[in-house]
């Protein structure tokens, strides 16, 4: 079930699964939101889609969220692509009609699901390895850093100081507000 928590006209709704997965992969830093004791908690965490069923990530052990909320807590992960202010002065017909107002163009994906934390070394290695491999391929190519490049005792200490987690995906909604509701002369 997807709770409509934002204005989403049909012409801005994005239902292309590949495009949604592409946006999440290109802009992996999510705002991860939950409610604890009536207060909203937000963390900015890089996440990765693991197929279409789950998001994976990790937090610092010092981040108290894994102690504050229980496994199964509902989470909202918000992924935002690039965005921009759009001035009325940029429309070619503005000098003639003056029928334009400012707007903001953006793309966003909301993924809801339930979180499960893990302190197991196997899960931490899988999450850190997957996220690292994905990002290193994008930025370093053939010279990609691998976890095995670091001394084992150092990696062990780093892994001891994180908590892995998975968010089982319940729903996905995406919005691409890119002025596609305007005539072609304006975009």
Model-derived features with residue positions:
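Conserved small/polar residues in nucleotide/adenosyl-binding loops
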Residues: 1-5, 185-187
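Histidine-centered active-site/metal-ligand motif
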Residues: 44, 58, 186
């Amino acid at each position: 079930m997807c709770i409509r928590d934002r204005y989403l006209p049909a012409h801005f709704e994005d239902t292309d699964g590949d495009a949604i997965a592409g946006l999440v992969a290109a802009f992996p830093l999510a705002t991860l939101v939950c409610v604890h004791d009536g207060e909203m908690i937000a963390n900015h965490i890089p996440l990765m889609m693991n197929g279409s069923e789950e998001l994976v990530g990790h937090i610092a052990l010092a981040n108290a969220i894994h102690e504050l909320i229980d496994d199964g807590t509902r989470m909202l992960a918000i992924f935002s692509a690039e965005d921009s202010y759009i001035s009325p002065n940029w429309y070619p017909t503005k000098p003639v009609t003056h029928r334009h107002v400012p707007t903001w163009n953006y793309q966003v994906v909301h993924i809801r699901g339930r979180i499960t934390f893990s302190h197991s070394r196997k899960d931490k290695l899988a999450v850190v390895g997957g996220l690292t491999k994905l990002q290193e391929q994008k930025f370093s190519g053939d010279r990609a850093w691998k976890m095995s490049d670091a001394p084992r005792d150092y990696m062990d200490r780093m892994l001891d100081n994180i908590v892995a987690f998975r968010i089982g995906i319940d729903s996905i909604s995406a919005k691409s507000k890119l002025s596609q509701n305007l005539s072609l002369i304006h975009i």
